[in-house]
Amino acid sequence: MEASSGSSPPHSQENPPEHGGDMGGAPAEEIGGEAADDFMFAEDTFPSLPDFPCLSSPSSSTFSSNSSSNSSSAYTNTAGRAGGEPSEPASAGEGFDALDDIDQLLDFASLSMPWDSEPFPGVSMMLENAMSAPPQPVGDGMSEEKAVPEGTTGGEEACMDASEGEELPRFFMEWLTSNRENISAEDLRGIRLRRSTIEAAAARLGGGRQGTMQLLKLILTWVQNHHLQRKRPRDVMEEEAGLHVQLPSPVANPPGYEFPAGGQDMAAGGGTSWMPHQQAFTPPAAYGGDAVYPSAAGQQYSFHQGPSTSSVVVNSQPFSPPPVGDMHGANMAWPQQYVPFPPPGASTGSYPMPQPFSPGFGGQYAGAGAGHLSVAPQRMAGVEASATKEARKKRMARQRRLSCLQQQRSQQLSLGQIQTSVHLQEPSPRSTHSGPVTPSAGGWGFWSPSSQQQVQNPLSKSNSSRAPPSSLEAAAAAPQTKPAPAGARQDDIHHRLAAASDKRQGAKADKNLRFLLQKVLKQSDVGSLGRIVLPKKEAEVHLPELKTRDGISIPMEDIGTSRVWNMRYRFWPNNKSRMYLLENTGEFVRSNELQEGDFIVIYSDVKSGKYLIRGVKVRPPPAQEQGSGSSGGGKHRPLCPAGPERAAAAGAPEDAVVDGVSGACKGRSPEGVRRVRQQGAGAMSQMAVSI
């Protein structure tokens, strides 16, 4: 119907509805009088669509109104029940009088829904066209409509007594068939209208067949726009979720806030109309606009900084999320593209770095925060036939990388110590104000802290005072001030000075040597088997990798005799581990007169790549040689030298060191001799490593 030019404007335009700031209020609060009682809304979500039963029954559609005609009753059953608004039975005392002001109903059609920012233009135009038409009687053209459209969805039998030519039932069935996937009978029963409201609205819309048709279209349009859209977001979300599983979004949900994941949660917040997500990019709030943060499904949620109670706007429609903690940028780790701009006067270091990916994606895409995908290939372990070999190769390669760096640092530190000791021996006026340079105990060397302490303690205890010695000569001159029995300590100092000079000479000749490993020999290593068991960790890191248990042949040059020994390096399987051996070592052990407690050191030439071996023999203390010619005493009687200093030196475990250190008695048990040799091996290993 078309509005005449001279008709008065509709009531919805004369008295425009007042839109409050809070759009979350119910429509019933905005309608006064009986209109608040006439409209009842069901906010439950729609289930899956079953087949339509007959939408009306004689028992449920019985009315006790005497004021309504048969035609209006038939219309109520037709438009109310079939249109999805089953009339609510009421007692005769209530009555079904028309609305005092039917304009309230029409205003309601033009009101903005709490989930909608603007009214639907189709509904407003329909109302304007209907109100501009001249009114007609309510019952005109309705006497012949006596049947109630009852039907099942799509092709099934329709329970209707009206003829096929009737426009109203046919229009409703076409609408019902087109929306069969999104609506059910239970959904339609959730919205109720009184008979008086239907009659008054039909009369206001022109009455008769046209008024009834206009009212039915109005109701169905409202149902379709505000209720059928509730289920569509859920379907769209499922489809987009399936797409995102194959090709995930490069930007994940911020880990500090969760948006509604489906259409059901969004409908609970107000039944928003679903629209496809837009690809437009909105700059962050720090640059003057509303910060837009895409969700995992691809929709954009803009955060308004204004004082409005609705803080989230979904597709230009207000949405109130559940209350959460402070959503300021300092407390949340947004993706890197949307890191909030620091406020004026604040340092950029106060903001925490954002997480590279959202926890919701399980860490599968490490580059999600950076805007691109980078999936690391970590399936190489399953390609190998044996996981043990693969793990061993990785471990050995990792240990080699770490050991190379530690070896370089150790060599630099050793050379620095040697140069420092050389400079300290030269007389300088500043030598009295300088102290000894000692390396930090941060794991630079490959010897244990106990052996390092054993090497450093004789130097520190060689001086009776606690003041640190400024040079090796000062340390050697200090014991000379003591009585004659302290000559053993003087011998110890001479041995240390000789070792230091040998070390300086060896550093010049062997500066290209790299220390690999050392091994204190056991009884089985020096026996008739002719093989030496090597430490596993050092062998895997520094020696060549073995493919088979037969091993490889390695020529090793003896540093002491310059003789090349052809030894075989192999391993024995030990459960899931390995035991590395160095075979054909019997001749080398006999030529160097190595015994249990002695040790070997293996080097590698940095330039040529060849391997060198050195056998270090732990010599017995000279005190045992001096006491071997004395008389008296039993077999195990300790022949300690006389004198309080010698006795104190013999009783102090710190002074009982190798290479000519006095204080050891002749009658030591085999366990004591073995312990002394092991201590001497630790001291000699420190010298070997420093070279």
UniProtKB/Swiss-Prot annotation:
- Where do the segments described as Disordered lie? 1-95, 135-158, 384-489, 618-691
Q: A GO CC term?
A: cytoplasm
Q: Which residues form a coiled coil?
A: none
Q: Where in the cell is it found?
A: Cytoplasm; Nucleus
State whether keyword Ligase applies.
no
Cite the residue spans of the region called Transcriptional activation: 1-121
Which is a Pfam family this sequence falls into? B3
UniProt biased composition (Acidic residues): 31-41
Low complexity composition-biased segments: 56-73, 402-419, 460-488, 642-661
- Which SUPFAM superfamilies does the entry link to? DNA-binding pseudobarrel domain
Q: In which tissues is it expressed?
A: Seed.
- Mark out the compositionally biased spans (Polar residues): 1-15, 420-437, 448-459
GO terms of molecular function? DNA binding; DNA-binding transcription factor activity
Q: Which residues bind DNA?
A: 517-619
Q: Which InterPro entries match?
A: B3_DNA-bd (IPR003340), DNA-bd_pseudobarrel_sf (IPR015300), LEC2-like (IPR044800)
In this chain, composition skew of type Basic residues spans 391-401
Coarse class of the protein's main subcellular location = cytoplasm
Which keywords does this Swiss-Prot/TrEMBL entry list? Abscisic acid signaling pathway, Activator, Cytoplasm, Developmental protein, DNA-binding, Nucleus, Transcription, Transcription regulation
GO terms of biological process kind: abscisic acid-activated signaling pathway
The task this protein performs is described as: Transcriptional activator specifically required for expression of the maturation program in the seed development. Probably potentiates the response to the seed-specific hormone abscisic acid (ABA). May bind to DNA indirectly.
Which PANTHER family did the record assign?
Answer: B3 DOMAIN-CONTAINING TRANSCRIPTION FACTOR ABI3
Name of the protein: Regulatory protein viviparous-1
Q: Which gene encodes it?
A: VP1
